[in-house]
């Protein structure tokens, strides 16, 4: 989550650029398919939804559309409700568009340029009035955008009357699905590396955060022995911290993160650098986090909504060099949300196989 307490309105102007970009790999057939729809939406000033599974390669799908928009002088914004997602996406955008002046706007990054090419949290859109010709909204269903009418209004007021909007998410809200014409909903069921989505497995487990439990400890120790990293999701910060204090006695390279943790960005970067083997986390890492050799465990999975479970499962198997992994839903009774999440993942795998967009 982000906020803006002091800001100035950016004076709106137009300026084109060549927007050359670099890709270190060949895009998949599905990515080209999505890219064509994005360019068409920008040209026609349409609203479309990329209903794309986690790990579909949405960031790269945007590149051709970004280039098309910038070459015709469009002001563009790539927006997400979550700071963590903005940080992740902005790195990849800057690495691809090396010669572009890109404003990265969130609570720890301020405006440097004229706002022609912006990557930001939704809160930062208060800086702009009728400025953007093209807006990409990643993780449109994420908190706080999904629950905050003023942020939804900021999206509208920052855009020109005629503009293109490209929504992107693996878990679109029913209201959004009903508002967008069927032909403008682009379903993308495959990951870019053409391997199937990991399907969750259920395990009965009742957490006792006052002692080390053999089942959880054995799984975490096996992960470490197999040189795999593990995200363990909790839906309660207090429970997570109490559990951490117990397991820290046995697992030295263990840490935790949550939305109020001022060191969370540093901890996530340390995880990527191999400093930690296991990280206890809230849903702050359910979106936007990517690394190789990663598996997830969800404590009390029966208490999560379907969308969160799909997003959490989507952390696994995202890298080309490591396209598989484990997703474990620990529960005290299988919930309907758990069943629906698993069904949605299996349905997308089936559709991707039918279209020939995955190998297995």
Label the predicted regions.
Residues 1-26:
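Cys/His-rich short segments
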Residues 23-46:
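N-terminal pre-P-loop "Q-motif" helix
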Residues 43-67:
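Walker A/P-loop
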Residues 48, 182-254, 356-358:
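Conserved interdomain linker/interface between the two RecA-like ATPase lobes of SF2 helicase motors
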Residues 87, 100-114, 254-282:
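Conserved helicase ATPase core of P-loop NTP-dependent helicases/translocases
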Residues 130-204, 211-213, 218:
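Post-DEXD/H (motif II) to motif III coupling segment of the RecA-like Helicase ATP-binding lobe
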Residues 139-142, 258-261, 268, 272-325, ...:
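Conserved RecA-like helicase motor core of SF1/SF2 enzymes
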Residues 159-175, 315-344:
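Conserved segment of the helicase C-terminal RecA-like domain
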């Amino acid at each position: 989550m982000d906020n803006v307490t002091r800001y100035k309105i950016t004076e709106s102007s137009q300026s084109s650029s060549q927007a050359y970009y670099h890709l270190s790999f060949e895009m998949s057939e599905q990515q080209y398919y999505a890219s064509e729809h994005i360019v068409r939406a920008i040209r026609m000033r349409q609203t479309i939804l990329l209903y794309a599974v986690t790990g579909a390669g949405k960031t790269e799908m945007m590149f051709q559309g970004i280039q098309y928009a910038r070459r015709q002088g469009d002001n563009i914004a790539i927006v997400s409700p979550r700071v963590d997602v903005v940080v992740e996406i902005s790195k990849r955008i800057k690495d691809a568009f090396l010669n572009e002046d890109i404003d990265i706007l969130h609570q720890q990054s301020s405006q440097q340029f004229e706002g022609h090419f912006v990557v930001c949290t939704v809160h930062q859109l208060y800086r702009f009035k009728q400025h953007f010709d093209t807006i990409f909204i990643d993780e449109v269903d994420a908190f706080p955008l999904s629950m905050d009418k003023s942020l939804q209004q900021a999206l509208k007021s920052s855009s020109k009357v005629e503009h293109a909007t490209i929504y992107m998410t693996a878990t679109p809200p029913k209201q959004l699905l009903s508002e967008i014409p069927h032909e403008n909903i682009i379903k993308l069921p495959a990951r870019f590396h053409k391997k199937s989505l990991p399907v969750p497995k259920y395990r009965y487990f009742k957490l006792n955060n006052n002692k080390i439990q053999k089942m959880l400890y054995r799984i975490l120790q096996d992960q470490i022995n197999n040189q795999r990293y593990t995200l363990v999701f909790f839906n309660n910060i207090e429970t997570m911290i109490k559990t951490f204090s117990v397991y820290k006695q046995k697992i030295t390279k263990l840490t935790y993160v949550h939305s109020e943790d001022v060191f969370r960005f540093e901890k996530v970067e340390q995880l990527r650098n191999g400093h930690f083997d296991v990280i206890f986390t809230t849903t702050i890492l359910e979106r936007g986090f990517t690394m190789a050799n990663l598996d997830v465990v969800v404590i009390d999975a029966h208490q999560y909504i379907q969308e969160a479970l799909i997003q959490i499962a989507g952390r696994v198997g995202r890298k080309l060099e490591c396209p598989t992994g484990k997703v474990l839903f620990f529960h005290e009774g299988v919930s309907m949300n758990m069943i629906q999440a698993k069904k949605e993942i299996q349905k997308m795998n089936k559709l991707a196989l039918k279209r020939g967009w995955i190998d297995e």
